[in-house]
C-alpha cells in the first residue's frame, strides 16, 4: 500500500471516529506566556499538568512514553521560536533547546518528562524576564552579546567587537 493510500484510509478511519484535534488557542496562550515572561501563568499551567493532558493533541506514537517525548520536542521547538521572536538571542535559545531535548532523552517515565517540561518552560520564561530587563542596553552592546554567543569558542578581542559594531576602540 502506498503512503498516499495509507493516509487516505487513516483519514477515513479518523472521520468515522470523529477524531478531532483541539483548538491551538491553549497552546498559543502558553507559548505567549513564556515569550512575555509571565512566570505566574507558566507556573499555573505547569502545576495543573496541562502538558500531559493530551486529549485532542494527536497521537505521535502508540507508545505513551514516546508520544509524550515527541510532544516535548514539539513544545521545546515552539518555545524556542517564540522566545527568539520575543527577543531572546537565537544561539542561546537553540542551545537551551538542545540541552533540554538531550536531557529528555534519558527520561524513563511520563512523570519525568512532564517535570523536565515544567523546568524547561520556567527556564525559558526566566530567560525572557532577564532579556526584557536587559533590553535597556544599547544596540552596540546587544550586537556584541549576539556576536559573543555566535563565536563563543573563538578568541574575541575588543577590536573584533568594535569592527563588528562599526565603532572605534
Show the residue positions of the predicted features.
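Short acidic alpha-helical/loop segments enriched in Asp/Glu that coordinate divalent cations
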Residues: 90-95, 136, 157-160
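Generic hydrophobic/packing signal
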Residues: 80-83, 144, 161
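N-terminal positioning helix adjacent to the helix-turn-helix/winged-helix DNA-binding module
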Residues: 136-144
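Conserved short strand/loop->alpha-helix "switch" segment adjacent to the catalytic nucleotide/phosphoryl-transfer site
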Residues: 64-66, 132-137, 154-156
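Hydrophobic, helix-rich cores of sensory/ligand-binding and other regulatory modules
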Residues: 1-127
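Basic/polar phosphate-binding segments, predominantly the helix-turn-helix DNA-binding elements
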Residues: 131, 150-169
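Helix-loop-beta hinge of the Bergerat
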Residues: 145-149
Amino acid at each position: 500500500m502506498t503512503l498516499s493510500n495509507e493516509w487516505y484510509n487513516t483519514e477515513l478511519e479518523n472521520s468515522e471516529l470523529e477524531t478531532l484535534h483541539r483548538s491551538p488557542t491553549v497552546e498559543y496562550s502558553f507559548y505567549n506566556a513564556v515569550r512575555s515572561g509571565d512566570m505566574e501563568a507558566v507556573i499555573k499551567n505547569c502545576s495543573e499538568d496541562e502538558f500531559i493532558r493530551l486529549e485532542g493533541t494527536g497521537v505521535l506514537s502508540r507508545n505513551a512514553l514516546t508520544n509524550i517525548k515527541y510532544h516535548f520536542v514539539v513544545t521545546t521547538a515552539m518555545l524556542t521560536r517564540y522566545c527568539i521572536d520575543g527577543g531572546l538571542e537565537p544561539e542561546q535559545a537553540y542551545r537551551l533547546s538542545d540541552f533540554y531535548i538531550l536531557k529528555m532523552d534519558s527520561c524513563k517515565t511520563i512523570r519525568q518528562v512532564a517535570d523536565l517540561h515544567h523546568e524547561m518552560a520556567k527556564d525559558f520564561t526566566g530567560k525572557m524576564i532577564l532579556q526584557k530587563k536587559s533590553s535597556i542596553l544599547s544596540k552596540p552592546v546587544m550586537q556584541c552579546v549576539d556576536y559573543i554567543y555566535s563565536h563563543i569558542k573563538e578568541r574575541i578581542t575588543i577590536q573584533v567587537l568594535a569592527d563588528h559594531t562599526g565603532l572605534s576602540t
